[in-house]
């Protein structure tokens, strides 16, 4: 088939003031090719004709033509002319509709999936929606030093080496592991060397790997009641039988744990989730003795331990362990920002080779750039300063919440004065249902979570989880006011008598 030619002069849009001439010409020609005004097989005007028509240097036009060739829009050689390709790059990037339709039809047939896939339940965490009172588990993201973080990021990019671009060991970037080991040793009394630290996308990934390594179908795993649902989901997905033990003011009630047959126990001793209590030293020693006697391993999730407002810090459970039976996990998502997706696990030496193997088969390693930036953020002292600053701010916000709640909610909801963390708990007057109260609060743009979302039983049936860290004092006051209106409406609806002052 003979090549098509055109005798028509092109009609191109005006060149924007700040756009280079070659870029303007490339964009204009590409647009006309995609729109069909320059159809497949047609010959473009010569570089001389375009130069004469638009008053451009031929070198500028040649540059634009070369870019069109490089991206697959035209073909040709000097002297033979330049022609629009019959198959454009956009066509290569999209599947035709008929093929899409066949794929959808095939997907409608039942698929054979593994036992894991049938057992696993979607864990979405906490919804990614705008912050409002009293959404729990959120730090004050507006106070994170974004400018400083960006500056360190750009510096790391300028200095990044070829070796760093290739990645790092499965367990993470060694300088970051060294910084984490030093930090948890100093602040939490954790006993470890850097080689025991694994950098992960978060504690949730650590739970998944621990479940894969330690839990067989039918094994018994113990958790606190109430408990972080992501942990329960990780263990159940691998076929674990979950045993729940209650929590009192000193922590998990060890007497409720089975005497034998438990493979693993998951606890949050530094700041029980979601109740907020701190496990006493005596209870920690009792739990360690039980674990040794029953040959169980312990997964210690030390989330939120950085933000302690009263009382002396209690050393991590791992620091009291002299038998190598505790896996210690921490995260930067609440200390810095959730999207960072970096956490860590301190692994007992005997488990380290198997953990490294499992990690290498999972995500290879955590994102390298984020590890580099976080390493510098810690080394330069910004991490410690940020924690100290935010601890003061969060303590003030907790005080505002307690004072406002005492004045406005005292007869309907008693809020606990927690020693640490980003949220607290509130206990409803008898007769008001927590689920109904949460639904009523939501109609007034207030988020409170019923504790029943974290476990069964009457002991937590009247409890609500209430976040405060992400809210300015004025937002806390407004939230308490709206919550009071919602709870008063529930009191009237359920005809609960007013408490006398």
Feature map (PLM): residue ranges:
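Conserved core of the PLP fold type I
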Residues: 153-295, 306-323, 394, 434, ...
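General small-molecule cofactor/ligand-binding pocket signal
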Residues: 198, 243-245, 327, 416, ...
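N-terminal basic, amphipathic alpha-helical segments
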Residues: 1-156, 350, 356, 360-367, ...
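Active-site PLP attachment segment
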Residues: 320-354, 366-369
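Hydrophobic residues in well-ordered beta-strands that form the structural core
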Residues: 223, 244, 300, 374, ...
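Helix-loop "lid/cap" segments that line or gate small-molecule binding pockets
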Residues: 344, 372-380
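Short glycine-rich anion-binding loops that position phosphate/pyrophosphate groups of nucleotides
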Residues: 139, 269-273, 334
